[in-house]
Amino acid sequence: MEMMPFSLLGFGFLLGVKHAFDADHVAAVSTFAAKNNSIKKSSLLGMFWGFGHSIALLLIGLVILSLKITIPENISLSLEIIVGVMLVILGVNTILTANKNKIHFHKHSHGQERHIHFHSHKATKNHAHEHLPFYQSMFVGLVHGLAGSAALTLLVLAAVKSFWIGLIYILIFGIGSIAGMMAVSSIISLPFTLI
């Protein structure tokens, strides 16, 4: 086995973190992060999303590295369409949840200073705590990982000659993706902690 260059590991990690900040990833995880007012819980949702995403990348990466194949373009496009439909469904669900929870804002002033406060009147009678959908977040990450796997694996196949180096690269990329998603979901939830 050839020596794994540290620069490739670092590059894989940084690409994973950057990958988490892609617009479609932010849109997907924001639908979960917006449903709670805890940075810790949002971070966990991001972690599970990143874990699902990384599992998909790892499984497809293993197949591609083992068989030395690429994903056909028609399959890649089909997976992208599935992710697009999933994002629309998540967006509609977020709008319906905001409506159900009666999220709104109030304009008012303190002396000369005018500002806006957002808040919610949840439509539950007993104000029961909702269980966070960690498995849902992981499933969305898994589906998202299927769609993004083509670009990652082409990059890996072009850059490395060894199965093991490719596998380690995908694992490091996944760890970066998980760390990035935890950061993204924490940042997104910050305003909701103030509601």
Residue ranges and their predicted role:
Residues 1-20, 42-47, 128-143, 168-173:
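Small-residue-enriched transmembrane helix starts and helix-helix packing motifs
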Residues 21-27, 146-154:
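Transmembrane helix boundary and interhelical junction motifs in multipass membrane proteins
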Residues 32-42, 159-163:
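Juxtamembrane helix-boundary/capping and inter-helix hinge elements in multi-pass membrane proteins
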Residues 61-86, 156-166, 171-174, 179-195:
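Transmembrane-helix boundary and interhelical-loop signature of multi-pass inner-membrane proteins
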Residues 96-145:
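Alpha-helical multi-pass membrane helix bundles of inner-membrane/thylakoid proteins
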